[in-house]
Amino acid sequence: MKITLLGTGSPIPDPMRAGPCTLVQAGGQNVMVDCGRGALMRLLAAGVFPGMVSTCLVTHLHSDHITDLNDLVTSRWVMMPVNVPLRVIGPPGIRAVVDAMLQMLAPDQQYRHDHHDDLRANGPLTVNVEEVGPGDSFTIGAVSGTVHETDHRPVRPSIGFRLEHEGKVVALAGDTVPCDGVDEMCHNADAYVQTVIRYDLVSALADALPNGQRMRDILDYHSSVEQAAQTAARAGVKNLVLTHYVPPMAPGQEDDWKAQATAHFSGPVILGPDLTSIEV
């Protein structure tokens, strides 16, 4: 199984980082987990065309995690010779989001149907949506997945995914604080991908901003680097993969971020720029 951090950014715009998105490749499947701003461009940089993505897993409905979903859907539809709908698996509410997105894209679809006979013959732009919750399971080709509860309150629901292929396990959490559901999802995983923030840097930034309370509010519903490392150690994870860096990680700060994790977790800690990857 190969994990590629397509986007390691966050809601804070960063010219060096796309929004939250992770690519998992296993058993001939290309699976995107979340689809933040710029994810499609990073997908191409990873050598994967939109039509090669079979499924997008969505952890929760915060805008920074789904901004590029419409681009993924449209690009697949326009570029593929055969209309194969994207499969989107996410928490309750994702169907309404996709329906609204398709309504937004209706004029574009009509323009393209009017201009391209073969595209019109392929049929309408559609998406296969599956709403899931903790305890549910699914398959993507030879990859099996289970759904686990995470804690991003007041965001409800929020979920994570445990993907397995040929004895290897990758656990992927979106935004969450440590909780039993994440521990269960990560148990003995070969890799655990966690979005993180730096409490110390966020607090300092909040103190410097006139509307700093808004920044300070995010401290209570994200995992810190240290907490992610503690979860990894507690769950017996082999590799800890960090992403969604808040505030944006500046070049040269990697060792500082990694040191906060290695103080609590003895295994490999993977972090870095977009397109950083690991195979397990």
Question: Which stretches of residues belong to each language-model region?
Answer:
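Cap/insert and terminal regions of metallo-dependent hydrolase folds
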Residues: 169-171, 177-274
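Binuclear metal-dependent hydrolase catalytic cores
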Residues: 1-171, 177-180, 184, 256-279
